[in-house]
Each structure stands twice: as structure tokens, then as C-alpha cells.
Swiss-Prot record:
Chain residues forming the annotated DNA-binding region: 74-148
Annotated source species: Mus musculus
Compartment(s) where it occurs, according to its Swiss-Prot or TrEMBL record: Nucleus; Nucleus, PML body
Protein name (database record): Replication protein A 32 kDa subunit
DNA repair recorded as keyword: yes
Post-translational modification: Differentially phosphorylated throughout the cell cycle, becoming phosphorylated at the G1-S transition and dephosphorylated in late mitosis. Mainly phosphorylated at Ser-23 and Ser-29, by cyclin A-CDK2 and cyclin B-CDK1, respectively during DNA replication and mitosis. Dephosphorylation may require the serine/threonine-protein phosphatase 4. Phosphorylation at Ser-23 and Ser-29 is a prerequisite for further phosphorylation. Becomes hyperphosphorylated on additional residues including Ser-4, Ser-8, Thr-21 and Ser-33 in response to DNA damage. DNA damage-induced 'Lys-63'-linked polyubiquitination by PRPF19 mediates ATRIP recruitment to the RPA complex at sites of DNA damage and activation of ATR. Ubiquitinated by RFWD3 at stalled replication forks in response to DNA damage: ubiquitination by RFWD3 does not lead to degradation by the proteasome and promotes removal of the RPA complex from stalled replication forks, promoting homologous recombination.
A Gene Ontology term for the protein's cellular component: site of double-strand break
Amino acid sequence: MWNSGFESFSSSTYGGAGGYTQSPGGFGSPTPSQAEKKSRVRAQHIVPCTISQLLSATLTDEVFRIGDVEISQVTIVGIIRHAEKAPTNIVYKIDDMTAPPMDVRQWVDTDDASGENAVVPPETYVKVAGHLRSFQNKKSLVAFKIIPLEDMNEFTAHILEVVNSHMMLSKPNSQASAGRPSMSNPGMSEPGNFSGNNFMPANGLTVVQNQVLNLIKACPRPEGLNFQDLRSQLQHMPVPSIKQAVDFLCNEGHIYSTVDDDHFKSTDAE
């Protein structure tokens, strides 16, 4: 799945004693040569994050941090709300439901006719890897990889990766052999940290239900969205899962059938 595109952050990054190891200048235990260096080498590992955490990151001496964790290359998972293509780049607005949508810019190779330059359509869930940037106090990502999700379990897996990576990176280096960090770390619930509560969609729906609801909301036709059209836009999703989500949304009053039992419209539509 995702790891076929590039090397992601994983537990295999850690040494046998449980400590985090990497090249000089990163998160490894300080050595005399590192301490003497005035210039820093930017962290090279990829850290899974949420948009809310990226927006709360602090920038000091050209280094982004979330709490005590230094970040540069990150991954996020979310749904594309808007996509706009220019001659040299594509700008996406990506929403993971933890904060307002974030701008993600992907530069395109004008001499490359392959599918790498194709625009991923709105209402598609994707995983993005890129570099965090800040311009005029507005944070954004410069993406070097954008991959549509093939399995919605990847969304859940990303959440677990976020929590795990932050726990390991924020673990005191002096306790590298002391075993796993406690899950009851009080810092985990502080603003900007990797609290599990940040990952719950505000409307209480699952990822699948949200994706179905968003597609129905986005349909401008008076009769609403046809179920066959819904299926064609969610080809990566099993049909029973789509039907189950539609039934749930109907029963909970989020959508309703219109001209027949196969056309649906959002109750929030004007």
C-alpha cells in the first residue's frame, strides 16, 4: 500500500534497545561532535501528523516543533475538498476533520506526460507526504507524494502511527532501555500534542459515512445523487459498505431519498 511509494516512519526505525537512531543532527543521543555544531541538520525521518498538530507547530530558528518533537517531513491523511491546477503546480485543500483544511501544493513536471501530473479529484481520501512550510504566518505542505487510499483502514492506521511516532520521538533519550513509554503520559492531552481525541470527526460519523455524505452534499442536481453515481465515485469501497453507510445516513436523518429509492439528497442542502 502506502510504503511502496517511499519509506515511511515505522517502529523498525528504532534500535533493539528501544531508542531512536538516525544520522547525526537528528533525534539521536547527542555526541560531542553534535553538541559542538552550531548549524543543525534538518530531521530526515517522516513523521505522521494531523492538520491540527501542523497548524499548532512552532517555528524557531527555522525548525518546526510540535511540543518537543522536531518535524520537517510529515504525512497526513484526509479528504480533498478542492483542487486547482496551474501550469507548474496543483494546489489541494485537504481536510482531516481535526482543523480547517490545509493547503497542499504539488509541483508538476511540465515535461512529464505520465499520470504523476494528474489531478486527484475532490472528495477523494488521500495520504500525503511532504515538507511543512510557513509563509507570512500561514502553514502549508509542499507534497512529494500524494496517494489515494485503497483501504479506509489506512485512515485508522495513520492515527495509530501518529500516536506511536510521537510517543517514541518524545521519549527521553536517557531512558532508551527503560522499555515502552506509558500510555498515560499527561502531556498527551495538551493542546498541540498527539491526543487520540483529535482524530474523532466532529459530526460523530465514521470515515466511510463522512465520505458518502460529502459526495451527496456536493451534488448540485435537484433530484440528488444517484446510487450508481455514488458507486462509481467510490470504486475503492465495497458496495455493501456504501449501502450500509447510505442506510445509516437515511435512518439518522442526514440524507433522504427523492424521486426514487436510488436518489439521495442531504438534509443540509438549501
